[in-house]
Curated annotation (Swiss-Prot):
InterPro entries: Cupin_2, OryJ/VirC-like, RmlC-like_jellyroll, RmlC_Cupin_sf
Name this protein carries in UniProt: Oryzines biosynthesis cluster protein J
One Pfam family cited in the UniProt record for this chain: Cupin_2
Family stated for the protein in its record: Belongs to the oryJ family.
Gene3D superfamilies associated with the record: Jelly Rolls
Pathway the protein contributes to: Secondary metabolite biosynthesis
Domain Cupin type-2: 88-148
Known function: Part of the gene cluster that mediates the biosynthesis of oryzines, natural products with an unusual maleidride backbone. The two subunits of the fungal fatty acid synthase oryfasA and oryfasB probably form octenoic acid. This fatty acid is most likely activated by the acyl-CoA ligase oryP to give octenyl-CoA before the citrate synthase-like protein oryE catalyzes condensation with oxaloacetate to form tricarboxylic acid.
Superkingdom, taxonomy of origin: Eukaryota
Organism name: Aspergillus oryzae (strain ATCC 42149 / RIB 40) (Yellow koji mold)
Length: 179
C-alpha cells in the first residue's frame, strides 16, 4: 500500500471513574488517559477502550477495572462471551475489507471520515460522521472508501444469542476477505 498519510484526528483520552475506599467518587489513575493505538497488518489500527466480562458488571472492589487492565496486556478475543467490548478503529485509506460475523449486537458510530458498511447480500450503506449502524449478527464488512484519508469509528459490541435462519445457527466467522 505504500506509506500512509498522517492522521489528523484529535488525540483520544479515556476517563474512567471509580470510588475511593471511603466511597468518594474519583477518577482511575492507574490506567493512562491518553490512548495508545495498536497498528495491525490488515489495514486498521485498534484501541481497546473498555471491556466487561459479564452483565451485570462487577463494579465492587474494581473487579471490572482489574479485568480490563488484564485485557490491555493480554488482548481478549474479538468478543468476550457474556460481556461487552468497546473499541475504536482507525481504517487506513484504501484498506481491504475483512468479512466477518460475530454473535453480537454491535453499535458502530462513525467519528471521522466516511465508512461503507456492506452486508453479504450485496447491500451497502455509506456512513458519514455521526451515523450509527446496529449490526445484528450479519456477515458484513467495513470499507474506507477514501484513498487518501483515514476514517475512525467507535464500536460497542454486546454478546448475543446466535441467530437462527431457516433452522441453521449462524455462528462466528472471521477473516474471510471477499473482493
Amino acid at each position: 500500500m505504500g506509506s500512509l498519510p498522517e492522521k489528523d484526528f484529535p488525540q483520544v483520552h479515556r476517563f474512567i471513574t471509580t470510588h475511593k475506599e471511603d466511597g468518594t467518587p474519583t477518577f482511575e489513575t492507574k490506567i493512562p488517559e491518553p490512548i495508545e493505538w495498536e497498528r495491525t497488518n490488515i489495514g486498521v489500527d485498534f484501541f481497546l477502550a473498555y471491556t466487561l466480562g459479564s452483565f451485570p458488571a462487577p463494579l465492587s472492589h474494581d473487579a471490572d477495572l482489574n479485568q480490563y487492565k488484564d485485557h490491555l496486556v493480554n488482548h481478549p478475543p474479538f468478543m468476550i462471551p457474556g460481556g461487552a467490548v468497546v473499541r475504536y478503529v482507525d481504517y487506513h485509506p484504501g484498506c481491504e475489507p475483512m468479512w466477518h460475523r460475530t454473535v453480537t449486537v454491535d453499535f458502530g458510530v462513525v467519528i471521522e471520515g466516511e465508512l461503507e458498511l456492506e452486508v453479504e447480500g450485496g447491500e451497502k450503506r455509506l456512513m458519514k460522521r455521526g451515523d450509527v449502524a446496529v449490526q445484528r449478527g450479519t456477515n458484513h464488512c467495513w470499507r474506507n472508501p477514501s484513498k487518501t484519508q483515514f476514517a475512525r469509528a467507535l464500536y460497542i459490541a454486546l454478546d448475543a444469542k446466535p441467530v437462527i435462519v431457516n433452522g441453521q445457527e449462524l455462528g462466528e466467522s472471521l477473516g474471510e476477505v471477499k473482493h
